[in-house]
Amino acid sequence: MSALCDPPGAPGPPGPAPATHGPAPLSAQELSQEIKAFLTGVDPILGHQLSAREHARCGLLLLRSLPPARAAVLDHLRGVFDESVRAHLAALDETPVAGPPHLRPPPPSHVPAGGPGLEDVVQEVQQVLSEFIRANPKAWAPVISAWSIDLMGQLSSTYSGQHQRVPHATGALNELLQLWMGCRATRTLMDIYVQCLSALIGSCPDACVDALLDTSVQHSPHFDWVVAHIGSSFPGTIISRVLSCGLKDFCVHGGAGGGAGSSGGSSSQTPSTDPFPGSPAIPAEKRVPKIASVVGILGHLASRHGDSIRRELLRMFHDSLAGGSGGRSGDPSLQATVPFLLQLAVMSPALLGTVSGELVDCLKPPAVLSQLQQHLQGFPREELDNMLNLAVHLVSQASGAGAYRLLQFLVDTAMPASVITTQGLAVPDTVREACDRLIQLLLLHLQKLVHHRGGSPGEGVLGPPPPPRLVPFLDALKNHVGELCGETLRLERKRFLWQHQLLGLLSVYTRPSCGPEALGHLLSRARSPEELSLATQLYAGLVVSLSGLLPLAFRSCLARVHAGTLQPPFTARFLRNLALLVGWEQQGGEGPAALGAHFGESASAHLSDLAPLLLHPEEEVAEAAASLLAICPFPSEALSPSQLLGLVRAGVHRFFASLRLHGPPGVASACQLLTRLSQTSPAGLKAVLQLLVEGALHRGNTELFGGQVDGDNETLSVVSASLASASLLDTNRRHTAAVPGPGGIWSVFHAGVIGRGLKPPKFVQSRNQQEVIYNTQSLLSLLVHCCSAPGGTECGECWGAPILSPEAAKAVAVTLVESVCPDAAGAELAWPPEEHARATVERDLRIGRRFREQPLLFELLKLVAAAPPALCYCSVLLRGLLAALLGHWEASRHPDTTHSPWHLEASCTLVAVMAEGSLLPPALGNMHEVFSQLAPFEVRLLLLSVWGFLREHGPLPQKFIFQSERGRFIRDFSREGGGEGGPHLAVLHSVLHRNIDRLGLFSGRFQAPSPSTLLRQGT
């Protein structure tokens, strides 16, 4: 009978059935009848065919009474559960399908969940098996767990895809779990297995876990819902036991000693041609049967129990290192742990992502690296190479924040000991060399992946191109481009070479995003030519792969600058490096010349974005922008008016700011920029000259050129007004019907307030005289460069002095008039009679006061006078200043002119300027040489003669003719009636005769030239 019940090779009976409250024990005759009924399916007494329900209960009776019949009974019960599942699915098929499973209506109440007549049988089976497990778990739990788990696998595979209510296993794990747990039969099997595992969890759960792994391998992926449910119920046990069973099976199938990726000795006979495979060359399911199941189970649990999986994997790793060196001796499981973990990580990106976050912390202690090195010493060279290849592949698949940390760890470990920055990191040389080799192989592997992302060359020719292959390691580094660039610029040996190469690969992989960003970081952080050369090398390596790299980098950096995300020191460094590159190109340097040329083109296309940087509040940024724009090539087409005016305004502002902060040595860049802008077009020249003159005469800049600044003028006026009890000006305004005009007497005599005395004295700020001279010379030098005629210096008599353009000088003259006396701008150039000065007293006083407060006006008049006939356009200023001086000398009661030093100097300068500008003949133009020797009334007489001459011979441009030999306009006074002086020269001679004792030697200077002399001067 035992032979009939137990299959060949089956284990012996686990023992007598437990005592229950069911039927009394059967006699031998009754037991024989039950066996016959079970085997034939016919009732031995009544002779009719047993129903499925009766047949199942007959088997349960035998299972209680005859333990050796368990194999046959359990096999028969498979059919019972199969019929119950079929009935359940048939009932679901009859129900209308509406929406997803969790929204579908329940089956009709008249249809039992387990099929007609089988629900109670399934419940009885669960009760019987539960009693067996509780009575003798060590004997029954392994058998029943294997039976239940295998039956669930068969049912899952059998009915997958055969019914419309059973979703496909791929991507429908939650729906499958809900469907099968809603079936009474499969839920009962799950409860039975959970009871078995609970009974053995404290002693030896390996049998249950082995059965789970075997079934998972055989019926995956239809069986995944079982694994997910059991793993969620027993995460700690399942994770540890699944890994333990997988490791044991890995050892049996060649893992211990076979290394990572070899099966016994087969790997050495057929080596893989690709040293860095995307997946193992031989399918892992064929080499190690259970490892695929381990990967699947842990993959399901990784989302909710990632911490437990990570702790268990790291525990296995540390335990293997603590067991001593690897190789052919020692515990096989310890020897195979590292290859096993590598293989798991290769097959499951989810597991790799789970561990990669703490992998660096796990390997950082020097003792761990030393133990790992000792552990791997006993492995053959071929197996070590295989594991190294797997490690390279795993690093390339690392993702998330752990990828950058892993890279830093590898680089720090591979660096020579003298350059390691981490304190206390003592790494053996063998470990250092291994990391060095790992990094080199990693870079080679990444290069292959990046440059072969689209598959084989012929792939996609006839159809759509294949999607690019993803490289998780490079994807994770996209957010660390700035850190990589900073590490590269440290120029530590080996490190910067590795990271520079990695930046190139990352730029090609993520094009076009990371390439411009990396180039921008290098340009904004490089502090020396050596560091700057890294940017040129990166560009040289990417120029073939990335088109438009430099314009993109330039635009991205400018966008960061204007958005305020690039700090001012980095902005200044970026602009200085650009200027250096463009300068190299203009000097014809080798190497980065092409880079400088391209950057020059990019900069010229963004002049409107660079111009505001000249106004940057940070001085170093503004100065760097000026250095770049000073040598940046302008576009081939003409600048638009808006671009030109924006550049000129910013350049002029930069000039005065540099002059204030750094003095003349700091304005070189601004001067060069403004000179180039003045040469772009006539409009540019006029704008530069106009803004320079206006800026120099502005109240905020007058003190740079020796001007007087009313520091507290407004404050003092307010105080004075508040203290005054009576104001003559206010009184007159109240008693007049209208506000007095600019020519009235009320606006002339305002030296003080009646009852309060004179106005408070002005608070004057002044600079050092030498500094004023330097500043003035810098401004005049810039104006001369801008006004210089294209021909340069062609006259030997000019002693190298540049020939100024009359049109440019005219622009300066017009700007002077508009700045000093705006209400007289555009006035007639003809000189009015002396009586006319009575109507312009206020204007003349204002002009005289401006000349006294701003000595720069005299220098600007000299500049204008050097390019006749431009001084004619300053006629209003000359009349006003001359009238103011006449009034002063008329009112002066001093015996000599030395008591009025400023007026004396102003008178001399005025006459000399008019002579230089050919407004006076030479005889009259030399009279200023004797002013210091005369009395004030005599100076007034001479100035009146000047006024009279100008009244008769007005300063009109039409009186000048162009002399091609000298390349300038001249005025021939001999052709004008009385142009040599005439009666006006007689006044000068009379003064000379009166002071012949002191001025006799000057008489030759005031003689009208002969016609022959004029002829020689004309030629």
Curated annotation (Swiss-Prot):
Where does the record place it? Answer: Nucleus; Cytoplasm; Nucleus membrane
Keyword match Acetylation: yes
- InterPro entries tied to this protein: INTS5, INTS5_C, INTS5_N
The UniProt regions of compositional bias labelled Pro residues, in chain numbering, are 8-17
Sequence positions bearing N-acetylserine: S2
Q: Please list which residues make up the signal peptide.
A: none
Q: Where are the transmembrane segments?
A: 534-554, 856-876, 930-950
Q: Which residues carry this modification: Phosphoserine?
A: S279, S1010
The record describes its membrane topology as: Multi-pass membrane protein
Similarity comment: family membership: Belongs to the Integrator subunit 5 family.
Any idea what this protein is called? Integrator complex subunit 5
This chain's source organism reads Homo sapiens (Human)
